[in-house]
Regions:
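Active-site or pore-adjacent capping/gating segments
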Residues: 1-15
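Thiamine diphosphate
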Residues: 17-202
């Protein structure tokens, strides 16, 4: 109430960044980055294998976004076979509505689910930036560390070929300025798989 608030201590300046992020169990790299006698994989397959392993082990995980469900499995085929393996309730398509794709992670996380979502191309993320900035990135801070939104937002960028002015943007320098989110930009298939799995447990 109001009187109780008046008697509360002033915020401590040292606590300003206390709840930018929830504590993480991932503090160091484990395992072999490129195991011997294993065939090298392309980035797309590394993404597929990482998501498949996560979904097999964690029933609370979901994958959704533009064209990731059903038979297509993403425009780069990084979700191929996942809908057939895990069903349409866990791998599904969404409308072409990035604000919904990103914003829905807040509600999904609130009920104990852990969404992995995809914005089809980096250029498309701008309509979802409001949800990313005002809801997802601030969730842990605004709840005093009690309710962090836990999700992975996949944003394909720098893929093979070129896609003209609406499919070729590099957005990482803008996103990296948002406090409360972590950006991973893998350069190898091993990095992609490791970072994806680390992000899930973070």
């Amino acid at each position: 109430d109001y009187k109780k608030a008046l008697k509360a201590e002033d915020p401590n300046p040292e606590d300003l960044f206390l709840h930018d992020f929830a504590p993480t169990p991932i503090l160091e790299e484990k395992g072999e980055r490129a195991p011997k006698n294993k065939e090298a994989t392309v980035m797309v397959d590394s993404a597929l294998f990482a998501i498949k392993e996560i979904m097999a082990e964690h029933p609370e995980s979901l994958l959704y976004g533009q064209d990731v469900g059903k038979r297509l499995g993403g425009v780069f085929r990084e979700a191929a076979t996942l809908a057939q393996t895990f069903g349409d309730n866990r791998v599904f398509n969404t409308p072409i509505q990035e604000a919904f794709i990103i914003g829905s992670t807040v509600g999904m996380s609130a009920v104990g689910l852990k969404p992995i979502v995809e914005v089809q191309f980096a250029d498309y993320i701008w309509p979802g930036l409001n949800q990313l900035f005002t809801e997802v990135s601030r969730s842990n801070y605004l709840s005093n560390g009690k309710w962090p939104v836990s999700c992975i937002i996949r944003v394909p960028i720098g893929a093979y070929g070129s896609g003209g002015p609406y499919h070729s943007s590099s957005v990482e320098s803008v996103l990296a300025q948002i406090r409360g989110i972590k950006i991973a930009y893998p350069s190898t298939g091993a990095d992609l798989k490791g970072l994806m799995k680390s992000a899930y447990y973070d």
